[in-house]
């Protein structure tokens, strides 16, 4: 097929153009090129959760569904890179699948109901903001206090599997019961935690300046001008560093399979 002869090494501009083509015209070729370009990223993320076990192929398929969802939902008009939106979307689909497959204990109705609303709010706000929402934004969206949101997220964490490695190991011998225990402090939204989980190993490829630029732009949501002022460099320099850092992260993710 002609589509297979297309190069997979796409620039940021190529990616945005293909996403726009797919969203506007439902172009199958554009979608195939995007999937071909990002399939190694999906494989890398999937392996972090499957460790090559019996669920590996299923997790890859779920990750691909997450990628397709990210392609459909990404707002290219904002101009942010696609990867910081796609990674938590893919991870979220995989973790939801694993929770649904392995969560075999009773969860109080209030936690289940409000936990579901919080999860939906995070997804809606991520689509709207094109970044992970803060606790106060989730609370405002649901008409709750920050304390209530934190309470529900913390309570829900006490019912979640403590390690996804345990889930996969149990699944390999047919068991559906995973080890349950309390898991640490609540982050500012599930998606930030998931993004850090995926990026923690590959983030070390960046130097300190690159790490700072990525932190200010994607975690603190500063624009390039304000980021430059924080670091004492020009806006143009920030733009160059951001492109370089994202390129390094993509290469590290694609090679870590």
From Swiss-Prot:
GO biological process: DNA-templated transcription initiation
DNA-binding region: 224-243
Short motif (Polymerase core binding): ranges: 58-71
Keyword Heme set for record: no
Function: Sigma factors are initiation factors that promote the attachment of RNA polymerase to specific initiation sites and are then released.
Family, as annotated: Belongs to the sigma-70 factor family. SigB subfamily.
Name of this chain's protein: RNA polymerase sigma-B factor
Organism, scientific name: Bacillus anthracis
Gene, per the UniProt record: sigB
